[in-house]
From Swiss-Prot:
Homodimer; the beta-strands of each monomer intercalate to form a hydrophobic core, while the alpha-helices form wings that extend away from the core. It is found in: Cytoplasm. GO terms for molecular function: mRNA 5'-UTR binding. It holds the Pfam family CsrA. It comes from Haemophilus influenzae (strain PittEE). A key translational regulator that binds mRNA to regulate translation initiation and/or mRNA stability. Mediates global changes in gene expression, shifting from rapid growth to stress survival by linking envelope stress, the stringent response and the catabolite repression systems. Usually binds in the 5'-UTR; binding at or near the Shine-Dalgarno sequence prevents ribosome-binding, repressing translation, binding elsewhere in the 5'-UTR can activate translation and/or stabilize the mRNA. Its function is antagonized by small RNA(s). It comes from the Bacteria. Keywords: Activator, Cytoplasm, Repressor, RNA-binding, Translation regulation. GO terms for cellular component: cytosol. The keyword Protein biosynthesis does not apply. This is Translational regulator CsrA.
Amino acid sequence: MLILTRKVGESVLIGDDISITVLSVRGNQVKLGVEAPKEVSVHREEIYQRIKQTKDEPYLASS
C-alpha cells in the first residue's frame, strides 16, 4: 500500500487518466474529487460492496 500525505488542493494521479484531489478537510472527514474517464466506474467502497453483493446473489425463480 502506498501511503501519501496531501494538502487541500493537492492531487494524486493514477495512470494518465485518473486524478484524485483533496477538496477539503473538516475534523476527521476528507472531501475528495475524482476525475476519471466515463468508462471507469468510481464508487464509495460501501456502495461497491452492495453492487457486488447484488450481482453475486442468485435470482429466485418464480413458481
